[in-house]
A protein has these predicted regions:
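Short alpha-helical
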Residues: 13, 36-39, 52, 65
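Local sequence-structure signature of Cys/Sec-based thiol-disulfide redox active-site neighborhoods
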Residues: 1-30
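Non-catalytic, surface beta->alpha helical segment in thiol-disulfide oxidoreductase systems
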Residues: 59-84
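Thiol-based oxidoreductase modules, predominantly thioredoxin-like and allied folds used
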Residues: 29-41
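Structural micro-motif
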Residues: 49-58, 68
Length: 84
């Protein structure tokens, strides 16, 4: 079973788009909202090689990046291979 983790924040259009994409595919995900869980921000920076923008998306412990990165792997057909 795949595991998707999305680091988000309040009032973030790209975060909402990423979550809506996974919902539309019936893919469960764990969301860490840094406004509600500030300690998760430092964790995210550490495991994403210093990225501070949101969202940050991980699939099966693989760092995907932000929403534009997610769109890129979808458009190139890599998403289906990664999510399996």
């Amino acid at each position: 079973m795949n595991k998707v983790i999305i680091y988000t924040k309040d009032i973030c259009g790209y975060c909402d788009r990423a979550k809506n994409f996974f919902k539309s595919k019936n893919i469960n995900y764990t969301e860490y909202n840094i406004n509600k869980e500030p300690k998760k921000f430092n964790e995210m920076i550490k495991i994403s090689n210093g990225m501070k923008t949101l969202p940050q998306i991980f699939i099966n412990k693989m760092h995907i990046g932000g929403y534009d990165d997610l769109k890129s792997i979808i458009n190139t057909g890599k998403f289906d291979k990664i999510i399996k």
